């Protein structure tokens, strides 16, 4: 399994200038290559390299391997852009079908444009232009001003990851600080023998609830989002450069808190699964944002800001590191089905938090009931596979 180890570089002002020049030169080359690729409709890495390598190598003044990495960055960007554009077109076409049924005019289909790269966007280094000295907590990085030996700082977990560092590392400039993001190949432990499933129901009010009764509230996260939303609305009216910077700062703060919260929730979920010797079952929520167009605006906003995919990703990789199997099960009607008798009816869900089966009288928290149903679906999925 591949994981990312992030380390912070400790640089002097002079070294920061050298790194900045390197980013700017590399991204300027990427923009030139991107324009050529778009104009000539050539998007494959090998095709771009064959046609442009020698000329841009002579004109740019960059080392051979940096030019190769820039070509790869452009090719990969177009590959991703074409995939996203295709998905965007499909979503728009589905939306237009729904709008036609309601008698609404169709939305315009998205138009793809040439890929553009920020002056200080990250660039990838491989072993030819970057060397790690983990024991010394030092890296040797190629720049336009020559090789620089830079110390770095990181946590113990990142140090252990760096022992298995392989492949590329990205040089990233973020908020006036320099980071290296190293790809590390971690050996997957064998999957453990489990005794049942721990069902995990994800939500907005309660970010996660498991089938053992543990619940993780999203009240503070939602309050922060509302506060940021209100503040951003007032800043957007001003439209000044200072207001834009404040907007970006608020957005980053909200993102950091959400990521921190999801990390902690996922650690607790995996810990519960390990202690109870269970696999983890979660709902397959793919495409959920496309199915909420009929909901009121407030709920659409809440779902749009719901970071369920990040939380599921964190749970998946942390569970894999512990050898805990993870299964994704069908999501529909888990909140309306009674986990005691199996009766499914919308009237069972009395409110956001209350579940009362109208057939057998079973009463409990609605999220806990859904988590129990998800655990049962995990068992059914495993039985069908066996």
Descriptions of predicted regions:
Residues 1-386:
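Nucleic-acid substrate recognition interfaces
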């Amino acid at each position: 399994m591949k994981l990312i180890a992030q380390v912070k570089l400790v640089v002097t002002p002079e070294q920061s200038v050298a790194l900045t020049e390197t980013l700017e030169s590399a991204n300027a080359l990427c923009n030139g290559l991107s324009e050529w690729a778009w104009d000539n409709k050539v998007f494959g890495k090998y095709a771009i390299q064959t046609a442009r390598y020698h000329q841009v190598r002579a004109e740019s003044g960059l080392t051979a391997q940096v030019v190769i990495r820039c070509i790869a960055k452009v090719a990969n960007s177009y590959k991703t852009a074409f995939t996203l554009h295709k998905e965007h077109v499909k979503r728009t076409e589905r939306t237009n079908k729904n709008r036609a049924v309601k008698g609404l005019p169709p939305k315009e289909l998205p138009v793809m444009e040439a890929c553009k790269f920020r002056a200080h966007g990250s660039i990838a280094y491989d072993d030819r232009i970057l060397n790690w000295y983990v024991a010394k907590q030092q890296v040797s990085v190629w720049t336009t001003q020559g090789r620089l030996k830079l110390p770095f700082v990181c946590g113990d977990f990142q140090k252990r990851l760096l022992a298995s560092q392989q492949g590329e590392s990205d040089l990233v400039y973020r908020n006036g600080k320099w980071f290296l993001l190293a790809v590390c190949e971690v050996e997957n432990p064998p999957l453990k023998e489990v005794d049942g499933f721990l069902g995990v129901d994800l939500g907005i009010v309660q970010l996660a609830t498991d089938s053992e009764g543990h619940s993780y509230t999203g009240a503070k996260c939602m309050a922060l989002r509302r506060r940021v939303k209100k503040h951003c609305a007032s800043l957007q009216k001003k439209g000044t450069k200072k207001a834009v910077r404040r907007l970006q700062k608020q957005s980053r703060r909200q993102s950091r808190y959400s990521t921190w919260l999801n990390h902690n929730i996922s650690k607790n979920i995996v810990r519960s699964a390990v202690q109870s010797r269970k696999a983890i079952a979660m709902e397959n929520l793919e495409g959920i944002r496309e199915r909420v167009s009929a909901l009121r605006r407030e709920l659409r906003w809440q779902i749009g800001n719901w970071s369920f995919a990040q939380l599921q990703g964190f749970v998946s990789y942390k569970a894999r590191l512990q050898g805990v199997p993870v299964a994704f099960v069908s999501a529909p009607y888990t909140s309306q089905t009674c986990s005691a008798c199996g009766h499914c009816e919308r009237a069972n869900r009395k409110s956001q938090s209350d579940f009362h089966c109208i057939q057998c009288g079973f009463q409990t928290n609605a999220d806990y009931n859904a988590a129990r149903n998800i655990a049962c679906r995990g068992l059914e999925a495993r039985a069908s596979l066996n």
